[in-house]
């Protein structure tokens, strides 16, 4: 123990009371936890006891209920205590459920049958309505849509009725003559007097028959209003005047006034005398009575004989009877001589007989004529409308074309005005500055050159690091920067082809070089310092590039073919450019500068010395002819085109070479031979300074003109 106490740490004297407090607090906490646990256990025990008591109470209640039921209904329970009533009730419910399902099925069937019956009834109703509708349509067609019947048909029917009646009664036809009002005879007057006497004697006997005749006349009038009449028959009836009947020996039971009344009614209405046609339905007895009454008073159909002959005239004799209808017996009468009638012209129309066939043909012809007339009118209207439409379209098109033409001319004039204003501004600037600003490179070209130079430097670093991803990214960026290189070349060619620039170049004695330095860098060694060191072998740089880039033999063959094509095309272009340059300078020497026509023959290069007295200024000479000016403009335009083609050839060779190479090989190629990266901007400043000094110097003649001319003509 002593050894153990030696290892215990000795607490400091000042902190002993803190340790005691900690121990006391821990003891209190333990006591509290124990008390809480005991309380929880007691609560759980109490809950369990309560649950047990509740279960016991429920069991007791159930037992009491069963005992009460057994006391009330002892028959329902067996000896074993099974409830028989509950079993029976369950069976009853099951049976009721089965019956209920059957009833449901029967009700559903009844509903279906009712639905089918209703549908059948609806179909029957629909059929009935359709049948009724069809019947009504047929009735309407029968009543109102009958075919058109000519009036001549009714006349033929009436004549048939009269002929049948005459044949049945054996009445012979009576010949009567038409007499004019101007030519009257004594015999006719005698017969008329006899008839009048007979009529006066028989007036009293025939009063009873007047009522029947009036009724018949009313029926005839009603029927005549319904039927259509023929105009020719009416005219024939109007012409009948003074009908004479020889009835001296006849007992007249029939009233002669009836005939006159009937004729007067027919003539007053301008209608023929026909039997009545009653369309209205009547009784059979009434119809028979009317027929009997009408048969008594019907007038037979008469034939008109205009020829005056002595043939005997047969007149009917009527036997009077009271109870029966009159019977007609023919009697012979002695003929009376009648004076011949001289025909006199009357304004009455000529009688014309028409048949149903002729009327139908005439109607068809009229219908066809009306159709043709209507069609011609429609065609004329349509042609007129089409002509108007075409005229309107033509006028609209003409106006639209006129507007478009005027608009095109206005656009062209506006463009010409813009170009003229631009040229005037350029001329004013050139007069002030002397085309110094024109020879300076544009800001876009300077920016493109600086961007290409930075990209080539980055490519060089990525090649040293062997970073392929950065190489691909930089190559894409390089091609994006040089997208507008063709437009820059065209802009620079326009600057060179300017007449002011060519004038200054001819003063200086500039001649274009045989090869462009950018194109030479493709196959020759590159000199960063720009010194005049010449390389004996043209393929020195090209061979080193093949070794560094590990070019395959297929690639080398393709590159050789590209080189051959490039040299061939560039040589032909250079010759054309050189010829144009000589022609332009000869124009300036002949028409602008004051020198002899053949300077080489009269002057030697050593003897020619600059002297201001031998020359005259440009302003003292007149301008050349318009033809010569136009020739100069055409040559300058062709020079511009050739320069743009030469620059495009250079760029096309670079793009074709880059398409054959891999990204790493292309990067090596651009680092070695980039036309934009190896340009020194200080050279541009030097050229501008020299150019400004030449322009600002007073001009009286070209400097060392003889030497420049010798160079120019020796090249040719």
Swiss-Prot record:
Subcellular location: Nucleus
Transcription regulation recorded as keyword: yes
One GO location term (cellular component): nucleus
SUPFAM superfamilies assigned to the protein according to its UniProt record, in alphabetical order: Leucine zipper domain
Swiss-Prot/TrEMBL GO biological process terms: regulation of gene expression
Region (Leucine-zipper): 406-413
Stored CDD domains: bZIP
Ranges for domain bZIP: 381-444
Keyword list, A-Z: Coiled coil, DNA-binding, Nucleus, Transcription, Transcription regulation
Residues in coiled coil: 20-142
InterPro entries (UniProt xref): bZIP (IPR004827), bZIP_sf (IPR046347)
Region (Basic motif) residue spans: 387-403
Region: Disordered, residue numbers: 173-233
Function according to Swiss-Prot or TrEMBL: Probable transcriptional regulator.
Protein name, per record: Probable basic-leucine zipper transcription factor O
Organism: Dictyostelium discoideum (Social amoeba)
